[in-house]
């Protein structure tokens, strides 16, 4: 790692070294989804500070007609679609080289969790200091947000562990597996809304709903989606929109595909059948537009920034929300708050044109902050951590034992990450909250994550003997 504070992202070199068979549409979908998330959060955030206490609102709640736009702009499923395709291709290559499930899952988890460990370590220190030094009523609403976006990492790890199952099912059953997943999601919603079962049943959909786009990505990787005529994709898109319109009109579901403050039901947390159908629509749209997207992404002027975004993806995703919190807090401390009012629901709404004018400076400060933080921290996303990446001296377990341990450890990490995303770091490390009838504590979840991470490394990590053999072979 360079001694400079800011290390340039090697975008041009990485773009030039792109393998000719790489699925650029998958990378483009991932980059587009990330940009919408990073830009969407700053646009939607509305903050008021009555008596010095931050109250968080949402621009979409202030103008309900805009919530229909989320039927296009909610593109988080594209992360899972792209990830499902990448996982399928990665597992195929690993399997062809004779690699086992545990070592493959460790390879995926190691790369994903490295920036998360750094994020949690820094945030835990900050949260502890804030808990000790700042008034709880001021700090708590903001510290609740610090881990909110970790839900993605938790859900993604869970569906990544299922990649071999998706691989086998997509090759044998094709799109029937997708219909089965949709049916399971619908059954969970039925149990939740119609049968009156405990709210905790809905937590199953954190796996099932996000498995839908991940499975669709596996279908893409194995050529199944490309085998369908374009008319079929148009029919899927139209049918998906129609089904969701009926579900929202006659069911308990809100219009918005993102969470709204104060709403009794969210399509995002826990996710619902509406979001699962939306994921299928997005997968069909990407398939329908595959040819023009490929041509677009062949252009160096387009492909270079896409490559750059993917190189810093986890850093950008994890750190943009803390930057947003910091900018909002600094603006308030400097007396530069955007003018807001408290709406009928008790949440802040923009107040006149002054809000728009103030937002120009707010967004500019946010963009500069995100740029600086990403440039500062992105090398850590790729730099090995000694306690995490170094080869182990212990013997490798047998493949069956390793597979079960790796799967269980990944599931534990995924579940604990979802727990931390729900609790936030307010009151860290002692605060416990109730979520869907379950007691959750962030410090306990982090401790379990660390233990499960050690188990995953033991099951699939490199060994010292293997590393020495590789070096000897290279020298020869």
Describe each PLM feature range.
Residues 2-476:
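Alpha-helical transmembrane segments and their immediate juxtamembrane cytosolic regions
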């Amino acid at each position: 790692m360079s001694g400079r504070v800011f290390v340039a992202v090697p975008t041009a070199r990485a773009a030039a070294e792109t393998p000719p068979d790489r699925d650029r549409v998958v990378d483009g979908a991932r980059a587009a989804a990330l940009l919408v998330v990073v830009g969407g959060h700053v646009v939607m955030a509305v903050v008021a500070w009555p008596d010095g206490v931050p109250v968080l609102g949402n621009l979409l709640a202030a103008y309900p007609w805009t919530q229909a736009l989320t039927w296009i702009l909610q593109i988080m499923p594209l992360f899972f679609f792209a990830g499902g395709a990448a996982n399928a291709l990665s597992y195929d290559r690993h399997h062809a080289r004779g690699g086992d499930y545990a070592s493959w899952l460790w390879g995926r988890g190691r790369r994903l969790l490295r920036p998360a460990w750094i994020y949690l370590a820094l945030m835990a220190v900050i949260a502890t200091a804030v808990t000790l030094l700042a008034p709880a009523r001021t700090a708590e609403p903001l510290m609740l947000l610090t881990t909110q976006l970790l839900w993605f990492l938790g859900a993604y790890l869970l569906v990544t562990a299922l990649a071999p199952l998706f691989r086998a099912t997509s090759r044998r059953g094709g799109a029937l597996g997708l219909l089965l997943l949709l049916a399971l999601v619908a059954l969970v919603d039925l149990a939740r809304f119609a049968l009156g079962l405990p709210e905790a049943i809905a937590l199953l959909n954190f796996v099932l709903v996000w498995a839908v786009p991940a499975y669709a990505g596996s279908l893409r990787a194995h050529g199944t989606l490309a085998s369908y005529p374009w008319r079929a994709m148009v029919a899927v898109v139209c049918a998906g929109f129609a089904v969701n319109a009926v579900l929202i009109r006659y069911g308990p579901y809100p219009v918005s595909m993102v969470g709204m403050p104060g709403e009794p039901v969210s399509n995002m947390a826990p996710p619902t059948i509406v979001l699962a159908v939306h994921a299928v629509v997005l997968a069909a749209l990407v398939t329908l537009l595959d040819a023009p997207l490929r041509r677009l992404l062949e252009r160096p002027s387009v492909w270079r920034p896409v490559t750059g975004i993917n190189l810093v993806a986890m850093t950008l995703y994890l750190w943009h929300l803390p930057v947003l919190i910091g900018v909002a807090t600094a603006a308030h401390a400097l007396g530069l708050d955007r003018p807001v009012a408290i709406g009928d629901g008790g949440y802040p709404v923009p107040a006149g044109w002054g809000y728009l004018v103030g937002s120009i400076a707010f967004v500019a400060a946010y963009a500069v902050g995100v740029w600086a933080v990403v440039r500062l921290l992105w090398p850590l996303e790729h730099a090995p951590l000694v306690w995490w990446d170094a080869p182990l001296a212990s013997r490798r377990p047998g493949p069956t034992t390793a597979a079960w341990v790796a799967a269980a450890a990944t599931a534990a990490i995924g579940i604990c990450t979802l727990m931390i995303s729900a609790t936030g770091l307010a009151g860290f490390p002692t605060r416990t909250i109730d979520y869907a009838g379950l007691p959750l504590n962030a410090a306990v979840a982090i401790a379990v994550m660390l233990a499960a991470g050690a188990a995953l490394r033991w099951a699939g990590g490199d060994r010292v003997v293997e590393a020495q053999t590789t070096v000897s072979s290279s020298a020869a």
